[in-house]
């Protein structure tokens, strides 16, 4: 798709971050944004594009996580079908899908994916499902036809294995870091509750205000998803690279993902602002706040004392410490 700033060099860097290099793999890695048309989609007769290098291969093996998508619901969400329709399509292919109505996204993923299976030498796919601890739960090899029949079943299984914050709602959700290496939207809305298109998706915790403190190193300045928060920090904005962030928005058309929220000078001020702007809070003197490292790692989270009674009632929650003050440094930051 358009990852890596929609450049060949940027996509090579993403692979390098995952330890995938020519030296490590013992084979060439070809990266290009050039595409060729492989046919027309079966129902809407739209042109379907594919990476030119991949089109010249004798065979293609797909690999992707199967997981709930962040923007739509359907038989095929994030997985092997999407890896063909959007991933192998590079930016041009991704744009051709995203520039159509989000209401039919699930139909387009299947339609374009089937076009690949019918026109390209797909050998098969390797589907991976992760558990709530960001660990591999299942690895399954699929033939091209099994991708069509089995991926929907694997998607349903993935809904049962993903992580959840074990509270229905809070006043303020604090996310230390977002990034494309965490989720396509920077943070997974199936956990944060902050959906790009809430008219099509729901789930996750319901927070009146959301604060995002920083971006990951691995996202290389791509701050997509920061627009889903109400408050952020100057640190994040200083690390944000528009040339990495904006191409993703142009490709997926969700420009509000790139909007910059209110900027505070440090973490303390960001939290203070969010906490004082929650008119729906049940108790203004005992606010319910949750802090998570990112949406891929929520085994250990911090909660304010306002949530302690609910935590004690939940047998799935273990309270590890007594209440303590957040460890702000001399600059008012948490890290």
PLM features per residue range, with description:
Residues 2-4, 179-181, 218:
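Short active-site-proximal "capping" loops at secondary-structure junctions
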Residues 50-179, 205:
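Conserved, well-structured core segments that form the ligand-binding/active-site neighborhood
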Residues 10-75:
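An acidic, phosphate/nucleotide-engaging active-site surface
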Residues 1, 5-11, 40-43, 71-76, ...:
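Short acidic, glycine/serine/threonine-rich loops at helix termini
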Residues 32-34, 63-66, 126-131, 157, ...:
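Fold-independent oxyanion-binding glycine-rich loops
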Residues 189-335:
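C-terminal non-catalytic interaction/assembly regions of soluble proteins
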Residues 3-30, 147-157, 277:
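Alpha/propeptide regions of enzymes that mature by internal proteolysis
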Residues 15, 19, 120, 141-144, ...:
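Short, electropositive alpha-helical surface patch
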